[in-house]
A protein has these predicted regions:
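Positively charged, low-complexity intrinsically disordered leader regions
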Residues: 1-63, 67
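Phosphate/diphosphate ligand-binding glycine-rich loop within oxidoreductases
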Residues: 43-163
């Protein structure tokens, strides 16, 4: 392993990590994928929970995160904002429909080990940059690392997969 400086850090934009950190992530991912293909189990994420907050529908992103967490011994908890009180900015709260992002981030980070968020387009009224603002607001208040599963500015996990 070249570095472990990315551990415990948010990943919101592709540029949040150095080249060396990205190379390490790719090396670790390749080794874990190889082990999985060979039937070697890993408990790297044993007793770890990832809360996945989806403001937008997803097939590939949701399933890849859920499968990855399961294959590494962890649990991915799916949160569909259409079926829960949707996390929102304090000035955009609607009674019986939403909760403050700050409160949501603090609560989820106390119960889990990471928060992943997908937010863009219709979910934020097609206001350019608001999806990114939602992800960054979660990161501001969370004590656990926040992963951007896609916003209107960045899609770092897809960028990594494209390499």
């Amino acid at each position: 392993m070249k570095t472990d400086t990315w551990k415990g850090r948010d990943w919101i934009a592709e540029t949040d990590y150095t080249r060396e950190e990205i190379e390490t992530l790719l090396d670790v991912a390749a080794e874990l994928k190889r082990a999985f293909v060979l039937g070697q189990d890993h408990d790297l994420l044993h007793r770890k929970t990832l809360f996945m907050v989806f403001y937008n529908a997803s097939l590939r992103t949701r399933n890849s995160f859920e499968a990855g967490m399961t294959q590494l011994g962890g649990h991915a908890h799916f949160l569909d904002v259409a079926k829960i009180y949707a996390p929102a900015f304090a000035n955009q709260l609607k009674a019986s429909h939403s909760e403050d992002i700050a409160d949501s981030a603090r609560t989820l980070s106390r119960m889990g080990n990471g928060i992943a968020i997908r937010c863009f387009g219709d979910a934020v009224g097609w206001q350019w940059g608001m999806g990114n603002a939602v992800v960054r607001e979660f990161a501001r208040w969370s004590d656990a690392p926040v992963i951007n599963m896609e916003c209107d500015w960045y899609h770092p996990c897809q960028a990594l997969a494209d390499i």
